[in-house]
A protein has these predicted regions:
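Donor nucleotide-activated moiety binding/catalytic core segment of transferases
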Residues: 139-141
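N-terminal Rossmann-like NAD(P)+-binding subdomain of aldehyde/semialdehyde dehydrogenases
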Residues: 1-137
Length: 141
């Protein structure tokens, strides 16, 4: 598994301006685990919101096929998380590995489902009413 730095990602770059740290704990024992995460500062939160707002117009212009690719890529990355990830989450939550693996699969499955909706265009809500000349009392044309 990749080294856990505990930094925030803002606009595609790491940021760790905060001075407060959140310590990862073993849920069963309360023992500190070797992972600390920098708590974002109010300025970092603002910067993250601004970065998201400025990325939105570009993302909105992407064709549905590219958005579907994006969701499929996230799903693949989630599925690629190995047993080390599952073990850490089990310690932090006191949940069994099967639950964590199930949640991971459910999440990646939902991302793939939404990707398929994008590919099919279901979100447009388009309906095609075929002509029915035999329809009574009036034909649909």
């Amino acid at each position: 598994m990749t080294a856990i730095l505990g930094h925030n990602f803002i606009g595609g770059a790491r940021s760790a301006a905060g001075t407060l740290f959140l310590q990862s704990l073993d849920a069963a024992s309360g023992e500190a685990l070797p992972y600390r995460f920098v708590q974002a500062t109010p300025e970092e939160v603002d910067a993250a919101a601004e970065a998201a707002a400025s990325a939105y117009p570009h993302y909105r212009q992407l064709p549905a096929s590219r958005r579907a690719e994006f969701l499929d890529t996230i799903a693949a990355e989630l599925d690629a998380l190995d047993d080390d990830f599952v073990a850490i989450v089990c310690r932090e939550t006191a949940l069994p590995a099967t639950r964590i693996q199930g949640e991971r699969s459910r999440t990646s499955g939902q991302l793939r489902l939404f990707a398929e909706v994008l590919r099919r265009g279901d979100f447009h809500g388009a309906r095609i009413d075929r002509a029915r000349p035999e329809r009574k009392p009036l034909p649909r044309v």
